[in-house]
Amino acid sequence: MAIGLIGRKVGMTRIFTEDGVSIPVTVIEVEANRVTQVKTLENDGYRALQVTTGAKKAHRVTKPEAGHFAKAGVEAGRGLWEMRLGEGEGEGIEVGAELNVEIFADVQKVDVTGQSKGKGFQGGVKRWNFRTQDMTHGNSLSHRANGSIGQNQTPGRVFKGKKMSGHMGAERVTTQNLDVVRVDVERNLLLVKGAVPGATNGDLIIKPAVKA
């Protein structure tokens, strides 16, 4: 897998092309990603880069975290993220190095991963796009009810994964093949066409698109 970066969703706006066409874009702030660990086949069984970004107040850094960041010689960040590396990727990157948005200068499309907005407990109509039942014709209580959830004595159970009411959202979601509209190295900004998962200020993982 290609090297990606950790960013923060700033919000949405629009930009205009020379032809006057309006393009909706999401602004992603990509601060310097500091390499905290380089995992190798010999030591860890797989190749990966572990990075952090941002800052965390000193009193919120646990002792294990403090030791890990101190060993890498980098400032404590707001989290740790790991990105798998393919054969030949990440060569020459050492612990303590900084990666910035400039690595996307020649990238046309990206995949963006984030945590979707939580919607709480929702019914089948909202959560799974179930059809509603009749509003009239003798139906007075079951307009938005899910309906049958199984068969009879055989199999005598409800199958795992059955679409039912429950907690909606707050899941890891990836939006693929978003066009890179602009890379602003001076302000550490990446502008991508369209929407990305999650709420404003949410953390995002941006990687070159796998299906591009």
From Swiss-Prot:
One of the primary rRNA binding proteins, it binds directly near the 3'-end of the 23S rRNA, where it nucleates assembly of the 50S subunit. This is Large ribosomal subunit protein uL3. InterPro entries: Ribosomal_uL3, Ribosomal_uL3_bac/org-type, Ribosomal_uL3_CS, Transl_B-barrel_sf. Residues 137-155 have a biased composition (Polar residues). The gene is rplC. It comes from Shewanella amazonensis (strain ATCC BAA-1098 / SB2B). Residues 137-156 are annotated as: Disordered. Gene3D superfamilies: 3.30.160.810, Translation factors (2.40.30.10). One of its GO terms (molecular function) is rRNA binding.
